[in-house]
Amino acid sequence: MSHPSWLPPRSTGEPLGHVPARMETTHSFGTPSISVSTQQPPKKFAPVVAPKPKYNPYKQPGGEGDFLPPPPPPLEDPGTIPSGSGHFPPPPPLDEGAFIVQRGNPGGKTLEERRSSLDAEIDSLTSILADLECSSPYKPRAPPGSSSSIASPPVSTPVTGHKRMVIPQQPPLTATKKSATKPQAIPIPVTPIGTLKPQPQPVPASYSTASTSSRPAFNVQVKSAQPSTHYMTGSSSGQMYGPGSRSYNTQQVPLSAQCPPPTTCAGTDYAYIPPSGQQAESGFGYTSNQGRYFEPFFAACPSYGGRNEADPAYGQQVQPNTWKREPGYAAPGAGNQNQPGMYSVSGPKKTYITDPVSAPCAPPVQPKERLVKNQKVLQNVVDDRVHGLRKSGFPAPMGPPSVPPSFRPEDELEHLTKKMLYDMENPPADDYFGRCARCGENVVGEGTGCTAMDQVFHVDCFTCMVCDIKLRGQPFYAVEKKAYCEPCYINTLEQCSVCSKPIMERILRATGKAYHPHCFTCVMCHRSLDGIPFTVDACGLIHCIEDFHKKFAPRCSVCKEPIMPAPGQEETVRIVALDRDFHVHCYRCEDCGGLLSEGDNQGCYPLDGHILCKSCNSARIRVLTAKASTDL
């Protein structure tokens, strides 16, 4: 904002004083603003070319250890078939280092006690037939009754087993027979494939949750509370809960137990043979329940344990191409009578058995992300269990208190596991209504609780957060899941900067303060400024634009009115001459009323404080000169 200033005359020697005037443009005043929260698809396997059959040419006829395969297909020339009693060259001396065989347990049965004299003849015939079929990469399938048992041979005799190799993935690939040496070894508990974290004492328990048969179930491996118990539950020991669509199958699996094969196997043998550079070590080991699935309802959908291939489960061991699938033996005569969509503990099963690796590896540290993921999975299982109990008519289960936030991830995971087991084994009483959202205790008994904000409270716990008055049956205000009585809620509200009363409805914020919309007015005209431009003076008083100009804008020296911007304009134009302000239309000659401007003939020629044009100024000078000469 500019103030008028005096302008000195251009020259003192001129007979007529021409005073130039300057025009100033002032911008309008500023307008402050008003502010009024997978599973990955199954991993695909490439087709595996079946290796050529292996046999022992130095096996003596009548030896023990092999089974009789079916006869080869008929040939066109029967004369080319050699007789079974052909002579073979004498075997060279055996090299002790050529066969790496581990001795079995001293307390188990010997190989000679397990096999009959018929098996000895089968071994020699198998070697002869294998020589005839060396031109074909495939061998005919063995009859169902000639399945080999998982037994250990003596140290000096390698054993040739016959198994079919099937890639456990959809679509099914071509299955071929594979001979592999499986000497007996000391049973070593091995966890499934993944990152190894030794757990020497706790017994792993598998919790399988299945909603539908269209996708694999997820299993979480946790530690049991009884580390000294080692047993395998039978077909009737599995616990099933079926209020909802999910079922929970709890089994404890032994860490070290030699599984004797039965006389007849209910399932088909599947084995993945390690590469030729590695020696198969043991046919026995820890039978994990994570890889188990059941053919009656999930024949085309094998279970992947609820984890991705790139995300190993808790306590797994990383070693490629060292796992084998062995048959899971079912109880004889056990039928499957369960409902569809639920896992069964009886009937034919297929179990993944992981053989120990030959070279030991250092156990890496368990990643924290995996523990957090297992914690979330267990929490979801517990929530689903509680939801299923409520839908079936049972209240929420009573159990241990919630986990404090100061727990480590490992302790919190263990606590959630125990809480889930406790909730599943201890269904709540009929008069249980839930857990109080205020104190965390159970609400038991009629008339002891109330429901508010979609939560359950004790009657004594549902009080105002400020004055602790009981709010049952009383109106209250809910703010961020917290209850307030009406007086305390009003005291928590913002107060108007003008009337100092609490703002119950809409808040208008301006200049960093809160106002009622009807209290935010101009101090001059008292008009509401809600949604209207305004400005503030040096004292902080609020004005509308018109009243601010009327109060603080410069005034014209002729009409005494404030010089304001033209309608529709944002700038103020004024003329400053002789330390006075003029409107553009008020800057005229006082004698003739002619509009003055910057031109030579239309300029301002003041005389004795009067604004005159050039002609009027000359006329006044002549009058004054004549009067002065008369006086003399």
Curated annotation (Swiss-Prot):
<keyword id="KW-0677">Repeat</keyword>
<keyword id="KW-0597">Phosphoprotein</keyword>
<feature type="region of interest" description="Disordered">
    <location>
        <begin position="135"/>
        <end position="249"/>
    </location>
</feature>
<keyword id="KW-0130">Cell adhesion</keyword>
<comment type="subunit">
    <text>Interacts with PDZ domains of SCRIB, with VASP and with ACTN1/alpha-actinin.</text>
</comment>
<dbReference type="GO" id="GO:0005886">
    <property type="term" value="C:plasma membrane"/>
</dbReference>
<keyword id="KW-1017">Isopeptide bond</keyword>
<feature type="modified residue" description="Omega-N-methylarginine">
    <location>
        <position position="246"/>
    </location>
</feature>
<feature type="compositionally biased region" description="Polar residues">
    <location>
        <begin position="26"/>
        <end position="40"/>
    </location>
</feature>
<dbReference type="GO" id="GO:0005634">
    <property type="term" value="C:nucleus"/>
</dbReference>
<comment type="similarity">
    <text>Belongs to the zyxin/ajuba family.</text>
</comment>
<feature type="modified residue" description="Phosphotyrosine">
    <location>
        <position position="241"/>
    </location>
</feature>
<dbReference type="GO" id="GO:0005829">
    <property type="term" value="C:cytosol"/>
</dbReference>
<feature type="modified residue" description="N6-acetyllysine">
    <location>
        <position position="109"/>
    </location>
</feature>
<protein>
    <recommendedName>
        <fullName>Lipoma-preferred partner homolog</fullName>
    </recommendedName>
</protein>
<dbReference type="GO" id="GO:0001725">
    <property type="term" value="C:stress fiber"/>
</dbReference>
<feature type="modified residue" description="Phosphoserine">
    <location>
        <position position="152"/>
    </location>
</feature>
<keyword id="KW-0832">Ubl conjugation</keyword>
<feature type="compositionally biased region" description="Polar residues">
    <location>
        <begin position="206"/>
        <end position="239"/>
    </location>
</feature>
<keyword id="KW-0479">Metal-binding</keyword>
<feature type="compositionally biased region" description="Low complexity">
    <location>
        <begin position="41"/>
        <end position="53"/>
    </location>
</feature>
<dbReference type="InterPro" id="IPR001781">
    <property type="entry name" value="Znf_LIM"/>
</dbReference>
<feature type="modified residue" description="Phosphoserine">
    <location>
        <position position="117"/>
    </location>
</feature>
<dbReference type="GO" id="GO:0098609">
    <property type="term" value="P:cell-cell adhesion"/>
</dbReference>
<comment type="function">
    <text>May play a structural role at sites of cell adhesion in maintaining cell shape and motility. In addition to these structural functions, it may also be implicated in signaling events and activation of gene transcription. May be involved in signal transduction from cell adhesion sites to the nucleus allowing successful integration of signals arising from soluble factors and cell-cell adhesion. Also suggested to serve as a scaffold protein upon which distinct protein complexes are assembled in the cytoplasm and in the nucleus.</text>
</comment>
<feature type="cross-link" description="Glycyl lysine isopeptide (Lys-Gly) (interchain with G-Cter in SUMO1)">
    <location>
        <position position="324"/>
    </location>
</feature>
<keyword id="KW-0440">LIM domain</keyword>
<feature type="region of interest" description="Disordered">
    <location>
        <begin position="1"/>
        <end position="118"/>
    </location>
</feature>
<dbReference type="Pfam" id="PF00412">
    <property type="entry name" value="LIM"/>
</dbReference>
<feature type="domain" description="LIM zinc-binding 3">
    <location>
        <begin position="555"/>
        <end position="623"/>
    </location>
</feature>
<feature type="domain" description="LIM zinc-binding 2">
    <location>
        <begin position="494"/>
        <end position="554"/>
    </location>
</feature>
<keyword id="KW-0539">Nucleus</keyword>
<keyword id="KW-0488">Methylation</keyword>
<dbReference type="GO" id="GO:0005925">
    <property type="term" value="C:focal adhesion"/>
</dbReference>
<dbReference type="GO" id="GO:0046872">
    <property type="term" value="F:metal ion binding"/>
</dbReference>
<keyword id="KW-0963">Cytoplasm</keyword>
<keyword id="KW-0965">Cell junction</keyword>
<keyword id="KW-0010">Activator</keyword>
<feature type="compositionally biased region" description="Low complexity">
    <location>
        <begin position="144"/>
        <end position="160"/>
    </location>
</feature>
<keyword id="KW-0862">Zinc</keyword>
<feature type="domain" description="LIM zinc-binding 1">
    <location>
        <begin position="434"/>
        <end position="493"/>
    </location>
</feature>
<feature type="compositionally biased region" description="Polar residues">
    <location>
        <begin position="172"/>
        <end position="182"/>
    </location>
</feature>
